C-alpha cells in the first residue's frame, strides 16, 4: 500500500505546491512508499477519498476535519523538512508502517 499525502494551503496554488515538492523529496529520501497531491483548503473535502494524511500550516490544519483512518498534520514551517519531517514520519510509522521500506 502507498501512503497518500495531501498538502493543503489557502489557495492551492503557492505554498501547497511547494510543500508537495518538499514532502515528496523528504519521503523519497526517507524510503517511504507515497504519493503527494495538493489543493486549496476549500477543496480538501472533495480530495479526502484519495488521501490518508493531510498536511497544512497550523492555522489551516485547525479548519480541517477528518474521520476514520485519516490524519491531519499541522506544521509551523511548511517548507522546512526539519519542521514537518518528524511530525509526518511519526504519523506514518504509527499508522502506516507497511509503507516504510
Swiss-Prot record:
Does the keyword field hold Transferase? yes
What reactions does this protein catalyze? Answer: N(pros)-phospho-L-histidyl-[protein] + L-ascorbate(out) = L-ascorbate 6-phosphate(in) + L-histidyl-[protein]
At the top of the EC hierarchy, this enzyme's class is transferase
Q: What upregulates or represses it?
A: Induced by L-ascorbate. Repressed by UlaR.
Query: Where is this chain's protein located in or outside the cell?
Result: Cytoplasm
Asked if Transferase is a keyword of the record, the answer is yes
Q: Which UniProt keywords apply?
A: Cytoplasm, Kinase, Phosphoprotein, Phosphotransferase system, Transferase, Transport
EC number(s) on file: 2.7.1.194
One GO MF term: kinase activity
Q: What is its main location?
A: cytoplasm
Q: What is known of its domains?
A: The PTS EIIB type-2 domain is phosphorylated by phospho-EIIA on a cysteinyl residue. Then, it transfers the phosphoryl group to the sugar substrate concomitantly with the sugar uptake processed by the PTS EIIC type-2 domain.
Q: What name goes with this protein? A: Ascorbate-specific PTS system EIIB component
Amino acid at each position: 500500500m502507498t501512503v497518500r499525502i495531501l498538502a493543503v494551503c489557502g489557495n492551492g496554488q503557492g505554498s501547497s505546491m511547494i510543500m508537495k515538492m518538499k514532502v515528496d523529496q523528504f519521503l523519497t529520501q526517507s524510503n517511504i512508499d507515497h504519493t503527494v497531491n495538493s489543493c486549496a483548503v476549500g477543496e480538501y473535502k472533495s480530495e479526502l477519498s484519495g488521501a490518508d494524511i493531510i498536511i497544512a500550516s497550523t492555522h489551516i490544519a485547525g479548519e480541517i476535519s477528518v474521520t476514520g483512518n485519516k490524519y491531519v498534520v499541522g506544521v509551523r514551517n511548511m517548507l522546512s523538512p526539519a519542521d514537518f519531517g518528524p511530525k509526518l514520519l511519526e504519523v506514518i510509522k504509527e499508522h502506516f508502517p507497511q509503507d516504510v521500506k
